[in-house]
C-alpha cells in the first residue's frame, strides 16, 4: 500500500481521537456526572409501606392522592378512587427516576430554558404521618427525550434525571375510567322505562319485547360504549331533589352482566348517574369475578356525565 496514504490515514486517526477526546472533555465539564444513578425518590421507595399522600402540582391544577384502605383516592374529586393505570405509571416513575447528571446552579434564564419555572410539575410525597419524604420540581425533557431537567428540594443544583413523567394534567384524568364501556355487539337487551328491546343473538335485530317493531336504539348503544365521569359525589353529598325524576335504563349483556343506570338531569345540561351491577341467572365466571372485584367502585357513588352522553341517556326511549 502507498505509504502516503498510510501517513494520511494515521493523521486522520490522530485528529479523530483528538476531537473525540475534546468532545468527551467538554461534556464532562458542561454536564459532569454525579451520584452514580442515585434514586431521586429514595425516601419514597424506602417507605412504600408507610406512604400517606402524593401531591402532583401542575400548571393547571393541584392533585392530592390520599391512601385509604390500601387504595389511592383523588381528594379533589369526592375522594373517589384513582385509576390503577395512572398510579402504576406514577410508581414506575418513582422507581425509574435516577440522577444522571448534575448541571450546577441555574440562573433565572436557565430555569425558564429548562422548564423549571411556572410550567414545571412538582411532586411531593408524604408518609402516613404527613412528613415530606421527597419534593422534586420536574421541568422539560432534554433534547434526546431520555432525561428531564429537575430540581430536588434541599439541592441548589439542576439535575438531569431519568423517568417518563407524563402526568395527567387535570384531577379528572386521575380517576378510574371509564365508568362503563360496553360494545354494542355484547348487548343482548336494553330496557328503558317499561319497554325492552331484546335480541336472542348478535346477528338478529333488536325487537321490542312482545311486539314485532324493530326499534332504533343505535345511539343509546353507542353512548354506552364509553361512559366517563367528570365529577364524583358520595351518596350523602348528592341531593337528588335538585334534579328531575331519573331515567332508568337496564342493560343486559350476552355473558350475563346486568347494569342498571339511573340518570338524573337538570337545567344547564347537567347530568349525573348512578350505576348498579348484578347478573342474570347464569352469568359467566368472568362476570361474577368482575362484580366481586369492582362493585365498590359504584356502590353509593354518583357520577357527573359528559353533556352529550348524559343528554342521550336521559332522553332515551324505545318505540
Task: List where the protein language model places each region.
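Secondary-structure "cap/kink" motif recognition
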Residues: 1-319
Amino acid at each position: 500500500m502507498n505509504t502516503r496514504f498510510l501517513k494520511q490515514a494515521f493523521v486522520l486517526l490522530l485528529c479523530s481521537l483528538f476531537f473525540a477526546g475534546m468532545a468527551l472533555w467538554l461534556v464532562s465539564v458542561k454536564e459532569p456526572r454525579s451520584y452514580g444513578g442515585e434514586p431521586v425518590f429514595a425516601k419514597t421507595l424506602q417507605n412504600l409501606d408507610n406512604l400517606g399522600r402524593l401531591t402532583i402540582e401542575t400548571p393547571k391544577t393541584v392533585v392530592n392522592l390520599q391512601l385509604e384502605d390500601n387504595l389511592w383516592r383523588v381528594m379533589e374529586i369526592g375522594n373517589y378512587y384513582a385509576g390503577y393505570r395512572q398510579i402504576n405509571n406514577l410508581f414506575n416513575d418513582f422507581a425509574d427516576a435516577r440522577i444522571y447528571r448534575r448541571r450546577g446552579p441555574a440562573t433565572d434564564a436557565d430555569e425558564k430554558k429548562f422548564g423549571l419555572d411556572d410550567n414545571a410539575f412538582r411532586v411531593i410525597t408524604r408518609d402516613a404521618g404527613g412528613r415530606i419524604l421527597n419534593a422534586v420540581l420536574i421541568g422539560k425533557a432534554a433534547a434526546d427525550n431520555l432525561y428531564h431537567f429537575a430540581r430536588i428540594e434541599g439541592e441548589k443544583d439542576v439535575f438531569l434525571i431519568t423517568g417518563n413523567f407524563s402526568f395527567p394534567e387535570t384531577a379528572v384524568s386521575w380517576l378510574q375510567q371509564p365508568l362503563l364501556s360496553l360494545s354494542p355487539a355484547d348487548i343482548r337487551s336494553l330496557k328503558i322505562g317499561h319497554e325492552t328491546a331484546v335480541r336472542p343473538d348478535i346477528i338478529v335485530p333488536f325487537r321490542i319485547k312482545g311486539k314485532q317493531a324493530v326499534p332504533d336504539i343505535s345511539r343509546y348503544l353507542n353512548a354506552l360504549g364509553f361512559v366517563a365521569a367528570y365529577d364524583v359525589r358520595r351518596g350523602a353529598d348528592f341531593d337528588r331533589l335538585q334534579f328531575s325524576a331519573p331515567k332508568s335504563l337496564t342493560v343486559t349483556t350476552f355473558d350475563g352482566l346486568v347494569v342498571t343506570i339511573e340518570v338524573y338531569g337538570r337545567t344547564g345540561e347537567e347530568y349525573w348517574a348512578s350505576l348498579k351491577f348484578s347478573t342474570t341467572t347464569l352469568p359467566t365466571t368472568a362476570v361474577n369475578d368482575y362484580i366481586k372485584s369492582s362493585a365498590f367502585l359504584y356502590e353509593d357513588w354518583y357520577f357527573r356525565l359528559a353533556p352529550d352522553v348524559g343528554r342521550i341517556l336521559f332522553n332515551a326511549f324505545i318505540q
